[in-house]
Amino acid sequence: MASVKLASLIVLFATLGMFLTKNVGAASCNGVCSPFEMPPCGTSACRCIPVGLVVGYCRNPSGVFLRTNDEHPNLCESDADCRKKGSGNFCGHYPNPDIEYGWCFASKSEAEDFFSKITPKDLLKSVSTA
């Protein structure tokens, strides 16, 4: 039952993100996004900065990610980032080529389990090899 609620919440955020970013326009890089959208903010000129595992906000890429990555306890670029922050042992990268960072999980199997519930099977291969 919890997975049904989670799936419904993910669909709601993804739909909301698609409509908000379409109305905002590509040049402004504002609005709600999902790291699972391709490209995440409607254009590859903007970056989706997660505030949760499946929802974030669009920003210009000029140094925003570096500061946000250091401040956010679950954003990571490597397993070492997760261990340093105390947020887990595995950095599960989003199965999206436009997202250059990941989310900290306790283990690789936990990341695979989460991503398998919300992404198409062909995208899951990139999580397993990251």
From Swiss-Prot:
Q: Where is the signal peptide?
A: 1-26
Q: Which InterPro entries match?
A: Albumin_I (IPR012512), Albumin_I_a (IPR032000)
PTM annotation: The C-terminal glycine may be removed from PA1b.
Q: Which UniProt keywords apply?
A: Disulfide bond, Knottin, Seed storage protein, Signal, Storage protein, Toxin
| Disulphide bond pairs | C29-C46, C33-C48, C41-C58
Chain positions listed as propeptide in the UniProt record: 64-69, 123-130
Q: Which domain of life is it from?
A: Eukaryota
Mention any Pfam family matching this sequence: Albumin_I
SUPFAM superfamilies for this protein: omega toxin-like (SSF57059)
MF-aspect GO terms:
nutrient reservoir activity; toxin activity
What tissues has this protein been observed in? Major component of both the cotyledons and embryonic axes of mature seeds.
Q: Note what the entry says on domains.
A: The presence of a 'disulfide through disulfide knot' structurally defines this protein as a knottin.
What does the protein in this record do? PA1b binds to basic 7S globulin (BG) and stimulates its phosphorylation activity. Involved in the signal transduction system to regulate the growth and differentiation as a hormone peptide. Toxic to various insects through binding to a high affinity binding site in the insect gut.
Q: What is this protein called?
A: Albumin-1 A
Q: Which organism is it from?
A: Pisum sativum
